Curated annotation (Swiss-Prot):
Protein name: Ubiquitin-fold modifier-conjugating enzyme 1
Domain of life: Eukaryota
Keyword Transmembrane set for record: no
Keyword terms of this UniProt record: Ubl conjugation pathway
Species of provenance: Drosophila mojavensis
General function of this protein: E2-like enzyme which forms an intermediate with UFM1 via a thioester linkage.
Family: Belongs to the ubiquitin-conjugating enzyme family. UFC1 subfamily.
GO molecular function: UFM1 conjugating enzyme activity
GO biological process: protein K69-linked ufmylation
Gene Ontology terms: cellular component: cytoplasm
Catalytic residues, chain numbering: C116 (glycyl thioester intermediate)
Length: 165
């Protein structure tokens, strides 16, 4: 189910140990530390391989995440806002990643711009609780979604390049 490139990417993202969500206040801080360490490592790996494609930050509690992601297509950079909340049942329940500006532009999206991850990602997440975290959701959820959907939306003329200069 996972190709060699994805397997290599995954092997370079640290697996998490602590099984805690936002409801477990004391342990959540420790889980959040693991999340940040995994995200930092994933971003460093992406930069080293020339495939840097997102920036994330969170509120103080680590329950709301937001930032930017981008996809390069025909040497043009398409940039999108990305956001998600950490579910109260996390890490059992994966975060629902949203790209609000693409809401309603593709069938592979739910209301509010939440990307569809049901068929491929969620079963993989369920098998890897609590080892998977936010970095894994980005690598296995958002990255492949962008790779499939953005070129299709561009070719259909649904999204167009915006020059940010």
């Amino acid at each position: 189910m996972v190709d060699d490139s994805t397997r290599k990417t995954l092997s370079n993202i640290p697996l998490l140990q602590i099984r805690a969500g936002p409801r477990e206040k004391d342990v959540w801080v420790q889980r959040l530390k693991e999340e940040y360490q995994a995200l930092i490592k994933y971003v460093e790996n992406n930069k080293q391989s020339g495939s840097d494609w997102f920036r994330l930050e969170s509120n103080k509690e680590g329950t709301k995440w937001f930032g930017k992601c981008w996809y390069m297509h025909n040497l043009l950079k398409y940039e999108f806002d990305v956001e998600f909340d950490i579910p109260v049942t996390y890490p059992t329940t994966a975060p629902e990643i949203a790209l609000p500006e693409l809401d309603g532009k593709t069938a592979k999206m739910y209301r509010g711009g939440k990307i569809c991850l049901t068929d491929h990602f969620k079963p993989l997440w369920a098998r890897n609780v609590p080892k998977f975290g936010i970095a894994h959701a980005m690598a296995l959820g958002l990255a492949p979604w962008l790779a499939v959907e953005v070129p299709d939306l561009i070719e259909k003329g649904i999204i167009t390049y915006k020059d940010n200069c």
